[in-house]
Structure formats: C-alpha cells, structure tokens
C-alpha cells in the first residue's frame, strides 16, 4: 500500500508597517533628561506641569487630585508657586476659592518640550553641555548632539521635498 505524503504548508507572516509620522515619544527619555537639566526641575514636577498645561485656571484641590499619583511631597505646590512655575490668578474671598494658572515660564517650558518632541533640535545651552560632571551626563550630551544633528538633517530634507 502506497504511503500518503502530507504536504506541509508554509505559513508566511505578514509585516504590517505602522505609521510613524507622529512618533514623538521615541526619544522621550533623552528629551526628559535634557528638560530636567535645563529647567532644574524634578521628574514629578515636570509631569505635574504637563498636566496643568491644558488645565487653564485650576483650584488647589485640582492640583492635589493629580498630585496623589506621585510620590508624597507636601511642598510641591508651594515650591512650584515660589519657583514661578504657577501663579495665583485670583485671591480667595468669601464664597470664592483662590484660582491658579501656569505662569508664562511654565507654559514656555512645556511648549518648548513639545516642539522638541516633534523634531525641533534641543538647545545646547544647558548645564549638561557646559561641563562634564558625570559619566551619564556625558553620555546623554553625546546622544543629544547626535539627535540634534538628525533633527536638523530631517528638517532640511522636509524643506527640500516641499519646494
């Protein structure tokens, strides 16, 4: 009796390419390190500024509502207020609570970070670029220089393609 031979079918996996035009988080770690160094701010404080950026006017209770997900820091609100990241917009009065908003300094910092995330070169006038204090700062500095070069070349390519 002849033996049956089963033909094995070979499955071919398809590669589904994704649209990476909005890949702004690719270099987030380096951008965050640069921003923390440039603005001399902590990572939770920066996250709080990102939250407040779109809030407009807010109460202190709204601030503390988002603050609960960070490590415990009772002085965060006071520090951001004293350092000029947020400002009092309205004093409290009978029947009204005080209102706060992000300062021009805070809005400009977050706006700059968004621009960098969308491909603008990072400024090299930060403490990280002035002196090589630690090995990690040197590594980040070299990586950021490489990124800036890549961002500039990409911007030039887009400029020549659109003409």
Regions found by a protein language model. Give the residues of each.
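Glycine-centered, phosphate/nucleic-acid-interacting loop/turn motifs that mediate DNA/RNA or nucleotide
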Residues: 56, 84-87
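Short amphipathic alpha-helical interaction segments
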Residues: 68-82, 96-97
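Short, cationic-aromatic polyanion-contact patches
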Residues: 41-42, 91-116
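Short acidic, hydrophobic short linear motifs in intrinsically disordered regions
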Residues: 55-67
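Short alpha-helical segments that sit at the start of domains
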Residues: 15-48
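Short amphipathic alpha-helical elements of helix-turn-helix/winged-helix folds
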Residues: 48-55
């Amino acid at each position: 009796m002849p033996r049956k031979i089963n033909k094995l079918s070979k499955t071919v996996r398809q590669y589904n390419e994704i649209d990476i035009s909005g890949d702004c988080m690719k270099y987030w770690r380096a951008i965050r390190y640069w921003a923390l160094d440039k603005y001399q701010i902590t990572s939770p404080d920066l996250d709080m500024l990102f939250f407040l950026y779109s809030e407009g006017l807010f109460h202190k209770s709204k601030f503390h509502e988002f603050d609960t997900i960070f490590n415990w820091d009772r002085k965060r609100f006071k520090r951001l207020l004293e350092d000029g990241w947020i400002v009092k917009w309205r004093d409290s009065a009978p029947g009204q609570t005080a209102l706060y908003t992000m300062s021009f300094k805070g809005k400009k910092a977050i706006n700059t970070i968004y621009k960098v995330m969308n491909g603008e070169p990072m400024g090299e006038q930060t403490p990280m670029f002035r002196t090589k204090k630690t090995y990690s700062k040197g590594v980040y500095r070299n990586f950021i220089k490489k990124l800036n070069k890549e961002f500039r070349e990409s911007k030039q390519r887009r400029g020549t393609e659109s003409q």
